Amino acid sequence: NEDALALLAAARGLPAGTAFAAEDYAEVNPYCFAAPVSPHIAAAEAGVEVNLNLIRALADRAAAKNDWLVVEGAGGWRAPLSDTASMADLATTLSDPVLLVVGVRLGCLNHAVLTAEAIRRSGLPLVGWVANHIDPQMPRVAENLAMLERLLGSAPLGVFPHDRSGEGTSQAALTAFDRLTVVIEQVANLR
C-alpha cells in the first residue's frame, strides 16, 4: 500500500519512496487487501482471517518503540473484519483512546453522532474528532462543521481538505501525516 509506505517513511524521518524490508512493512500494516470493499469481504477473498491478537501484539511492540502509536481503522466503527469481529472489537482489544474521523459528505451529521454514541457506549474514551472532506462538491460545508461541533460537543481537532492538487498518493499521504502529527500531539495532551 503506497500510503502505508509513505507514512512509514515519514514516521522514520526518511524520504518517500524508501524501500523497507517486508518484515518492517508487515509490522505496521499486517493486513492489506487489494479490493476496495468491506474488510471482511476483502479478507475472505484473500483467504485470510484477521487476527485481533496479532494486531494487539504488533501494536504493543510498536508502542514500546515509539512516542505514540496511531492505529487506522477501515470501513467505520462497526465494519466487520470477519464473521465474528468488527473494528469496534479491534478498538476494544487495543483499549486505546479513539479519534473519530468524520467523512464530510451528505449524511455525515447522523453518521458521526451515531458513531460517537457507539464509541462512548463501548467504554473507550472518545478524545475528539477530525473532519475529512471526502466530497469536494458538498454544499454548506461550514454549516455542517458548525452543527457537528454542536452535536459532538467539541471543535474538530483538525480539518483535512479534499486534495485537489492532483499530487500523487505518496505526497498526499506525507501532507496528511504532517497534519495528523499536529492532531496526535493535541490528543496526547488530552490523555
Where do the protein language model's features map onto the residues?
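N-terminal phosphate/diphosphate-binding loop that engages ATP/GTP or pyrophosphate donors
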Residues: 1-49, 53, 58-61
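Inter-motif core of Ras-like GTPase G domains
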Residues: 82-105
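C-terminal lobe/tail of nucleotide-utilizing enzymes
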Residues: 117-191
